A protein has these predicted regions:
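N-terminal, polar/charged subdomain of small-to-medium soluble alpha/beta proteins
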Residues: 1-111
Length: 111
């Protein structure tokens, strides 16, 4: 079983540039957790609660990171610790300051 959250929007103060650290910006997270048979019983107590996953992402993003890679890695590690999935994939996107691209992104996978 795979659960997914796409486009979880979080405001944070991540980045290398002083204006990114000072003013902050929006970040979008896509999270995939491989959870085995958890949830097949149709009981929330047996499953991974999507709200708790979103809360964990927000908590990690409440810290400051210079690099998207570090933010994605720490988020993936925290989700592994809290929910013990078989695998987790975290992708973080942002609109980069000073680059003429739609977005930049970093992806971390565990294990």
């Amino acid at each position: 079983m795979r659960i997914e959250l796409h486009g979880l929007e979080v405001f944070g103060y991540h980045g290398v540039l002083p204006e990114e650290q000072r003013d902050g910006q929006r970040f979008w997270f896509d999270v995939t957790l491989e959870v085995g048979d958890r949830g097949a019983s149709d009981r929330l107590a047996d499953a991974v609660d999507y709200r708790l996953v979103a809360d964990a992402v927000r908590e990690v993003s409440g810290r400051r990171f210079e690099l998207l890679e570090a933010l994605a890695t720490e988020t993936a590690d925290e989700l592994m610790r809290r929910f013990e999935p078989e695998q987790v994939v975290v992708r973080v996107r942002k609109q980069p300051a000073g680059l003429a691209v739609e977005y930049s992104a970093a992806t971390a996978e565990r294990p």
